[in-house]
Regions:
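Juxtamembrane transmembrane-helix termini in multi-pass membrane transport proteins
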Residues: 2-62, 123-144
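Selected transmembrane alpha-helices and immediately adjacent juxtamembrane segments
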Residues: 95-121
């Protein structure tokens, strides 16, 4: 049961490194200089977005055997590893919403929209298909988002300029490849191959 919380937390925290929502957090922190409403907006947006993604994943998971889900999870980890190596860029449309609303509402809207189709949302779908405790998966993916984004919000421009993002992306990609290997091993076990 603890895996349903800890694995999603780690996976999403790794996937979020250098992601466009992390860049968005940095921009919002620099623009508003009010970290707590921004963090609250991240929590609300992530819970809403990942709850929907988790529901889709739980529904999706009901159609497949454990072996098939392990193979799908392994493929998604490999894809996420490759995706992690590509730096995200923040769209100008997402940054332009900051003028219309305050820090909380701007963050809520911008993060919710930025997460649609993002690798962390896709990871949430796959994790919810894999683990039976949906609420723990959603809490875990939300914690992962916070682990990656809260330091960026609190540190602002200073931390983002000093971090070796290329090295961090490579380490995160390596971690995803390791997770893919573990998932392949579990898929082979579930398929009766080993």
């Amino acid at each position: 049961m603890l895996d349903s919380l800890l694995v999603p937390t780690a996976i999403v925290a790794l996937a979020e490194i250098g992601d466009k929502t992390q860049l968005l957090a940095l921009i919002l922190a620099a623009r508003f200089r009010k970290p707590w409403p921004i963090i609250a907006g991240i929590v609300a947006a992530t819970l809403a977005n990942h709850a929907a993604a988790g529901a889709v994943g739980a529904w999706f998971g009901s159609f497949f055997s454990d072996a098939v889900l392990h193979w799908i999870l392994a493929a998604s980890f490999c894809a996420t590893a490759l995706w992690t190596l590509v730096p995200d860029k923040l769209d100008d449309d997402e940054a332009s919403t900051t003028r219309k609303f305050g820090p909380f509402l701007t963050t809520l809207i911008a993060f919710f929209l930025a997460e649609i189709g993002d690798k962390t949302q896709i990871a949430t779908v796959m994790l919810a298909a894999q683990y039976p405790e949906l609420w723990l998966v959603i809490i875990g993916t939300t914690l992962g988002m916070l682990i990656a984004n809260v330091p960026v919000v609190l540190a602002g421009n200073f931390a983002a300029e000093k971090l070796p993002l290329t090295l961090i992306r490579r380490l995160a990609a390596t971690a995803f490849f390791i997770l893919a290997i573990v998932a392949v091993y579990k898929a082979m076990q579930s398929s009766g191959w080993i």
